[in-house]
């Protein structure tokens, strides 16, 4: 509710019990879940999804306003809605600030190597309802913080109305205007410098080609110490095999809540067909497809050269106590020197291209030379082309995957249509091949069959899909006091697929059957004959890579989602035969329906608004599974993968020669095509 009149009468006491974390429990049942504090008195009770003691307190006392102590929501029982406004004194805002100050004393437990995981309200913030002397300092801290905010607010208003305050405000405005002018001047200087560099790079070389064939002169180096010279001489006398990184075992540094992007990029790079099509795109020869900076610094050679030092900086990190031999399995932990490649914080070309960034990143990750990459250029390209993911907020990995593939598809289609004359024939052919892989690798088709109950007439519609969003059975959505029976702590993936393809009855008479209305003329003013019907979804064409998105959320209360933390049992081999239409089963070999597990994206945490994403990927080059946790990579077994709490599953079809598509004669009748959504509709008598 935007305006609640009961908030204007709110008067908070400075020693309210909500400021003491030890009292964040129900006074009747002592539970700490969904605790609501009355804003009229010091009473604390549980919500309606626990024992409903807060509502009973309102019925007994008539106090309408209550605040949830962790989510900081305010609810009015008289208005029967959540409150969004505040009283003129701003007490609710100050109260929320005080509670955040109390909770901020325990946030150090969540800091892990420069990355803070924002846990849910039911995380480490829960304090047992014990009366110990430790709660008194926290209450005093909250009271002091609230009084300081009130005093600062009063002094700020008084100072702004004084003559000195107005003069200071005017001076600040002048400084901001001067800073804007300086920034504009700096921007103009950068633009002039960029144009000058472009002109110098495009100018013809002054030296002849004969001079370029000579070997470069000696490079000046710093004088080495005695210990360094001894190590170099020992290495020259006893040459050893240089330490190598296994191809694909390259970590991606977390640049600030970018675990969702890192996990998806690791999965896409481990899908062999998707990876190979982007590796075949060479930016140095495909100039029109990937417009480069004219200074030539965007090219990535086999080893870092001096010309690319402005774009990529190589940092040598020495691991202590490790042997200088063997492959790097977990971001350089088993070798004496691991190389970290740090991309430039701006895209490497004037024209931002996700295809170019994917090519560069995949080439580095599968070169076997880098143990860790900081994907700054990829992140800024995503920010520029997908504004919804701009910033360092927590994001959903499934939404990012869909948006990334959509933008890559749009980019390839626009390059092939708008600049067709300028692109050579070989590059146009290469672009079409990549676009075909992007469009078809996840593309499948569903058969939507609606059966009229009155005349048993069946209408079939073919719809495209790129992933299957599977819902949990109904028993996991029914919450009774937050308790889940022990026999429902696990769910089968096959059960979720069966629920997706089961027959459901449409509510009421809402279906206009073509057979029942066939004798009715179009000019007839009488309404259409509506009847009851059944609907079923079946797989009509299987994709090369099957994406299964597990919808791990349920609604608990009003406008509140929570995660379903049930373990889903999935196998390494998945057979899709039971979920396809019957005509497909008779026309194809059984091996066509077999899928092998390729990757798993896992979400750690109790809610989708916070947590952490990691990925389990199968390395096709080495034949092993690897757990990709940002910059840390560990080899694991398939048994460990199957025990994870999966969020997105990727299965690759074993045989791709046969087309898992139903032939046209099996569905005879009328065919309707739609250019808008590319759907085909078949009707059967």
Curated annotation (Swiss-Prot):
The active site is at residues 259, 612. Its EC number is 3.4.19.12. It is an enzyme of class 3 (hydrolase). Belongs to the peptidase C19 family. Zn(2+) 2 binds at residues 26, 29, 46, 53. It catalyses: Thiol-dependent hydrolysis of ester, thioester, amide, peptide and isopeptide bonds formed by the C-terminal Gly of ubiquitin (a 76-residue protein attached to proteins as an intracellular targeting signal). Deubiquitinase that plays a role in several cellular processes including transcriptional regulation, cell cycle progression or innate immunity. Specifically deubiquitinates histone H2B at 'Lys-120' (H2BK120Ub), a specific tag for epigenetic transcriptional activation and acts as a regulator of mRNA splicing. Antagonizes DNA double-strand break-induced ubiquitination of H2AX thereby participating in the maintenance of genome integrity. One of its GO terms (cellular component) is cytoplasm. Zn(2+) 1 binds at residues 4, 6, 76, 79. Keywords: Chromatin regulator, Cytoplasm, Hydrolase, Metal-binding, mRNA processing, mRNA splicing, Nucleus, Protease, Thiol protease, Ubl conjugation pathway, Zinc, Zinc-finger. Component of a complex with RUVBL1 and PSMC5. Interacts with centrins CETN1, CETN2 and CETN3. One of its GO terms (biological process) is protein deubiquitination. This is Ubiquitin carboxyl-terminal hydrolase 49. It comes from the Eukaryota.
């Amino acid at each position: 509710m935007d305006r609640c009149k009961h908030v204007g009468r709110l008067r908070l006491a400075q020693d309210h019990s909500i400021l003491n974390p030890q009292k964040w429990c129900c006074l009747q049942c002592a539970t700490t879940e969904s605790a609501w504090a009355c804003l009229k008195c010091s009473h604390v009770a549980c919500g309606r999804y626990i024992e409903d003691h807060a509502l009973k307190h309102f019925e007994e006392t008539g106090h309408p306003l209550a605040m949830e102590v962790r989510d900081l929501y305010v609810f009015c029982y008289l208005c029967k809605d959540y409150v969004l406004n505040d009283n003129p004194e701003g007490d609710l805002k100050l109260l929320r600030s005080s509670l955040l100050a109390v909770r901020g004393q325990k946030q150090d437990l969540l800091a892990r190597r420069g990355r803070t995981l924002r846990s849910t309200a039911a995380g480490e913030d829960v304090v047992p309802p014990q009366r110990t002397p430790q709660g008194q300092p926290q209450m005093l801290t909250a009271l002091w913080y609230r009084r300081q905010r009130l005093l600062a607010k009063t002094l700020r208003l008084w100072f702004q109305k004084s003559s000195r305050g107005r003069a200071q405000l005017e001076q600040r405005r002048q400084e901001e205007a001067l800073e804007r002018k300086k920034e504009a001047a700096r921007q103009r200087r950068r633009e002039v410098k960029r144009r000058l560099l472009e002109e110098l790079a495009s100018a013809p070389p002054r030296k002849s080609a004969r001079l370029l064939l000579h070997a470069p002169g000696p490079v000046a180096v710093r004088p080495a110490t005695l210990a360094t010279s001894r190590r170099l001489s020992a290495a020259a006398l006893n040459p050893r095999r240089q330490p190598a990184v296994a191809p694909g075992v390259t970590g991606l540094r977390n640049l600030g809540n970018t675990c969702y992007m890192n996990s998806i990029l690791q999965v896409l790079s481990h899908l062999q067909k998707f990876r190979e099509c982007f590796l075949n795109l060479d930016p140095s020869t495909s100039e029109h497809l990937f417009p480069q900076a004219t200074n030539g610094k965007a090219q990535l050679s086999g080893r870092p050269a001096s010309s690319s030092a402005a774009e990529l900086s190589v940092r040598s990190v020495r691991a202590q106590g490790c042997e200088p031999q063997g492959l790097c399995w977990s971001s350089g932990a088993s070798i004496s020197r691991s190389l970290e490649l740090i991309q430039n914080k701006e895209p490497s070309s004037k024209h931002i291209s996700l295809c170019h960034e994917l090519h560069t990143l995949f080439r580095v990750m599968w070169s076997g030379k880098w143990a860790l990459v900081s994907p700054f250029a990829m992140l800024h390209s995503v920010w520029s082309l997908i504004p919804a993911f701009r910033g360092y907020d927590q994001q959903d990995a499934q939404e990012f995957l869909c948006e990334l593939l959509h933008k890559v598809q749009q980019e390839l289609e626009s390059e092939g249509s708008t600049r067709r004359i300028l692109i050579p024939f070989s590059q146009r052919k290469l672009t079409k091949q990549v676009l075909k892989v992007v469009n078809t690798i996840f593309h499948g088709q569903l058969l939507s069959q609606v059966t009229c109950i009155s005349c048993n007439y069946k209408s079939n519609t073919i719809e495209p899909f790129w992933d299957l969003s599977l819902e949990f059975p109904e028993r996991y959505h029914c919450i009774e006091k937050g308790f889940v029976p022990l026999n429902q702590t696990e769910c089968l993936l096959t059960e979720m697929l069966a629920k997706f393809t089961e027959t459901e009855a449409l509510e009421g008479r809402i279906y206009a059957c073509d057979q029942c209305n066939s004798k009715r003329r179009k000019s007839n003013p009488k309404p259409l004959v509506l009847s009851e019907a059944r609907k079923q979804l079946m797989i009509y064409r299987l994709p090369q890579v099957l994406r299964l998105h597990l919808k791990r959320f349920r609604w608990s209360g009003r406008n509140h989602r929570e995660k379903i933390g049930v373990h889903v049992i999935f196998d390494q081999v998945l057979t899709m035969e039971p979920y396809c239409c019957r005509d497909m089963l008779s026309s194809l070999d059984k091996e066509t329906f077999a899928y092998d597990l390729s990757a798993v994206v896992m979400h750690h945490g109790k809610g989708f608004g916070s947590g952490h994403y990691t990925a389990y990927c199968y390395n096709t080059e080495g034949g092993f599974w690897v757990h990709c946790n940002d910059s840390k990579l560990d080899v694991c077994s398939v048994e460990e993968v199957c025990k994870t709490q999966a969020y997105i599953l990727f299965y690759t079809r074993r045989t791709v020669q046969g087309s898992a598509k139903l032939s046209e004669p099996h569905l005879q009748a009328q065919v309707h095509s739609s250019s808008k959504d590319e759907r085909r509709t078949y009707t059967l008598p």
